Swiss-Prot record:
Catalysed reactions, semicolon-separated: deamido-NAD(+) + NH4(+) + ATP = AMP + diphosphate + NAD(+) + H(+)
A GO molecular function held by the record: NAD+ synthase (glutamine-hydrolyzing) activity
UniProt xrefs under PANTHER family: NH 3 /GLUTAMINE-DEPENDENT NAD + SYNTHETASE (PTHR23090), NH(3)-DEPENDENT NAD(+) SYNTHETASE (PTHR23090:SF7)
HAMAP family: NadE_ammonia_dep (MF_00193)
GO cellular component: cytoplasm
Organism from which the protein derives: Bacillus mycoides (strain KBAB4)
Residues annotated as binding Mg(2+): 51, 163
InterPro entries reported for this sequence: NAD/GMP_synthase, NAD_synthase, NH(3)-dep_NAD(+)_synth, Rossmann-like_a/b/a_fold
Keyword Ligase: yes
Entry protein name: NH(3)-dependent NAD(+) synthetase
Source lineage: Bacteria, Bacillati, Bacillota, Bacilli, Bacillales
């Protein structure tokens, strides 16, 4: 088995999918996990990007089905901007599409800035822009877990195969969640599901960005990665990609393994 095949298997990627079937499977997963845990529903941060839009709509469909079947479940969507978000219109469009039971908004700027200032005062150095970006991601997850803890809700994560293979998420930030309904999907497959669900094309054709950096607001994921999503998707779907691209992907996969595992102990062997 080639490394490419090993990665596809490890990340549960299918080269070809039926969007209708995948939507059904992922809604059922959300419902089944909710029933098993006894939780009262879900909470998810909504950025206006493809991934949170898809996960949010799946979550709302799942809790609606639970209620229709006589159960009790709710979904809370959370806007978590840092000051003014450049693409706020897209976030509002996503919320209109998702139709969450409840939507709330937290501006994380005061919390992030207070921490950054305290760090500088205590350690006599400023956080790098990159590390401050990770603080933003982690504060967003702290907020979601606070809501989830108060309301008895599970926190949904938006990680999918194209992010997982590169480790393109913040450890214990957007990478910290209770369940991941988009696991196994490539970026283009996620677009296919949103299209099937009837989302406005603006929500799945927009340029993907983590938008965590103050110095480079709205920087494209592809710029930061040095790899396009089409290249990642081709690789993950078992297609041929240029050797240098495959090398980049495989290198990122290997060095980011710790981000896909629980904290290491001396009894684990994945890190050796």
């Amino acid at each position: 088995m080639t490394l490419q095949e090993q990665i596809m298997k490890a990340l549960h990627v299918q080269p070809v999918i039926d969007p209708k079937v995948e939507i059904r499977k992922r809604i059922d997963f959300l419902k089944d996990y909710l029933k098993t845990t006894g939780a009262k529903g879900f909470v998810l941060g909504i950025s206006g990007g493809q991934d949170s839009t898809l996960a949010g709509r799946l979550a709302q469909l799942a809790v609606a089905e639970v209620r229709n079947e006589g159960g009790n479940a709710t979904f809370i969507s959370v806007r978590l901007p840092y000051k003014v978000q450049k693409d706020e219109d897209d976030a509002q469009l996503a919320l209109q599409f998702i139709q969450a039971d409840q939507s709330v908004a937290f501006d994380i700027a005061s919390t992030v800035d207070a921490f950054s200032n305290q760090y500088e005062n205590l350690l006599d150095e400023s956080l790098t822009d990159f590390n401050k970006g990770n603080v933003k991601a982690r504060i967003r997850m702290v907020t979601q877990y606070a809501i989830g803890g108060q309301q008895g809700l599970l926190v949904i994560g938006t990680d999918h195969a194209a992010e997982a293979v590169t480790g393109f998420f913040t450890k214990f930030g957007d990478g910290g969640a209770d369940l991941l309904p988009l696991t196994g999907l490539t970026k283009r497959q996620g677009r296919d599901l949103l299209q099937e669900l009837g989302a406005d094309e603006r929500l799945y054709l927009k340029m993907p960005t983590a938008d965590l950096l103050d110095e480079k607001p709205g920087q494209a994921d592809e710029t930061e990665l040095g790899i396009t999503y089409d290249q990642l998707d081709d690789y993950l779907e078992g297609k041929s990609v240029p050797a240098d691209v495959a090398e980049k992907i495989e290198k990122r996969y290997k060095v980011s393994e710790h981000k896909r595992q629980v904290p290491a102990s001396m009894f684990d062997d994945w890190w050796k």
